[in-house]
Amino acid sequence: MFLRHVIVFSFIALLAGCAGFGSRESVEGQGNPAQWQQHKDQLSSIDGWQIEGKVGVRAPKDSGSGTLFWLQRQDYYDIRLSGPLGRGAARLTGRPGHVSLEVANQGRYEATSPEELLEQQIGWKLPVSHLVWWVRGLPAPDSKSRLSLNGDSRLSTLEQDGWQVEYLSYVEQSGYWLPERIKLHGPDLDVTLVIKDWQPRKLGQ
């Protein structure tokens, strides 16, 4: 179903703001923990970006893919989806406290959070607000996480709140090493994100 695909893709929009990091992570793997801390501190300063890429979702009874445009400006987001989904396009916009999803030829849906919107429309409970961190190659700071670092002291895998995130490749853009290909594995749901163009920004407080 197109609407189901759109809403699942929309959880890329999570947007909980950029709070500080806690000390709730367990780190292992090849990398150097001190270098990882430096890398993490650098990425945490990114509070805006423009992303273009592709996203795919696979569930037991559903699958789909499409193109993704994601504009983030601190706590505001504008996410647009189109492509081989079969029936037009969708746009998700919002700030904390209000989320709006417009689907071509189907209508407008609103909620107070991405999580609420997802649960209202298809009945799934997912940690969607984590993705604003995961897409930058960071663990979300508000729950425990288990990290494995690669030889460059960047995330190789991340386990958090019942999800496993695999970082398959990175790209350097504007002095930042950012995820290029990400796979997310959760209960009965797999998501693949391939980022073709990263434009990170530091917008300030």
Swiss-Prot record:
Leader peptide range in chain numbering: 1-17
Lipid modification (N-palmitoyl cysteine), residues: 18
Record function comment: Plays a critical role in the incorporation of lipoproteins in the outer membrane after they are released by the LolA protein.
Family: Belongs to the LolB family.
Location(s), subcellular: Cell outer membrane
InterPro entries according to UniProt: LolA/LolB/LppX, OM_lipoprot_LolB
Covalent lipid sites (S-diacylglycerol cysteine): 18
Protein's UniProt name: Outer-membrane lipoprotein LolB
Pfam families: LolB (PF03550)
Lineage: Bacteria, Pseudomonadati, Pseudomonadota, Gammaproteobacteria, Pseudomonadales
Main location: membrane
Gene behind this protein: lolB
BP-aspect Gene Ontology terms: lipoprotein localization to outer membrane; protein transport
Subunit structure as annotated in this protein's UniProt entry: Monomer.
NCBIfam families: lolB (TIGR00548)
An example Gene Ontology CC term for this record: cell outer membrane
Membrane topology, as annotated: Lipid-anchor
UniProt entry tagged with the keyword Transmembrane helix: no
Keywords in alphabetical order: Cell outer membrane, Chaperone, Lipoprotein, Membrane, Palmitate, Protein transport, Signal, Transport
